[in-house]
């Protein structure tokens, strides 16, 4: 019985991810997800307690999917600056290719699970994509002897790359090529590092 329960829970998560991926979070329905899993509409609530908790679990899985996309093709032993440039390009590509997932991860829900203080940004949920980005950004801080606080560095870098991704996926950014994205991220990091050192 426990195995069937875990299998159903995983199926509910994967069907929810596919629903978000194809239709967006605004059109996601717990009833539709239950129906696609062949269970009653109350089953998701039995396993997750509430729609909010279900979305939080789905967000954790989506963040892992985002992490895999963000670090794809990147050697983690290279310097943090180069990693951030490559991660930035992957981030923008993700925004273009996975529009609904980008929307749910970076526009609709991320700040429900993050806390900002004067010192840093912390998460109160498992968001491996953000946690990896944070670790590389803070590694850059150490490698370049940057004097800004952790929170300032994270806010500046995260808001820049998220903003760039929004621009590139809009009609304004249709002419942006991957080379342009890489050059833009590299230039931003150069300006930031030279201005902060």
Could you describe each region identified by the protein language model?
Residues 1-23, 27, 31-32, 36, ...:
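Basic, helix-initiating cap at the start of DNA-binding domains
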Residues 12-20, 62, 66, 70, ...:
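Short hydrophobic clusters on alpha-helical segments that form packing/core surfaces
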Residues 51, 58, 62, 66, ...:
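Hydrophobic/aromatic residues within well-ordered alpha-helical segments
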Residues 70-71, 75, 116-142, 151-155, ...:
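Amphipathic alpha-helical packing segments from all-alpha helical-bundle domains
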Residues 97, 157-176, 191-197:
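Amphipathic C-terminal alpha-helical segment
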Residues 38-48:
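Short hydrophobic/aromatic patch on the recognition helix
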Residues 97-117, 166-174:
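Amphipathic alpha-helical segments used for helix-helix packing
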Residues 57, 71-100, 153-157:
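Hydrophobic alpha-helical connector segments
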């Amino acid at each position: 019985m426990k195995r069937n329960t875990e299998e159903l829970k995983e199926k509910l998560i994967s069907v929810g991810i596919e629903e978000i991926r194809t239709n967006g979070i605004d059109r996601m329905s717990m009833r539709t997800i239950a129906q696609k899993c062949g269970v009653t509409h109350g089953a998701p609530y039995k396993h997750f307690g509430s729609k909010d908790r279900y979305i939080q679990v789905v967000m954790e899985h989506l963040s892992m999917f985002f992490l895999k996309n963000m670090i794809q093709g990147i050697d983690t032993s290279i310097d943090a600056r180069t990693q951030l440039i490559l991660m930035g390009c992957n981030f923008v590509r993700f925004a273009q290719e996975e529009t609904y997932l980008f929307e749910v991860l970076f526009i609709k829900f991320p700040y429900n699970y993050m806390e900002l203080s004067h010192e840093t940004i912390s998460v109160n949920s498992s968001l491996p994509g953000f946690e990896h980005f944070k670790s590389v950004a803070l590694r850059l801080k150490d490698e370049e002897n940057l004097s800004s606080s952790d929170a300032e560095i994270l806010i500046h870098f995260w808001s820049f790359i998220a903003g760039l991704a929004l621009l590139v996926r809009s009609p304004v950014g249709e002419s942006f090529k991957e080379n342009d994205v890489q050059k833009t991220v590299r230039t931003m990091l150069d300006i930031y590092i030279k201005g902060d050192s």
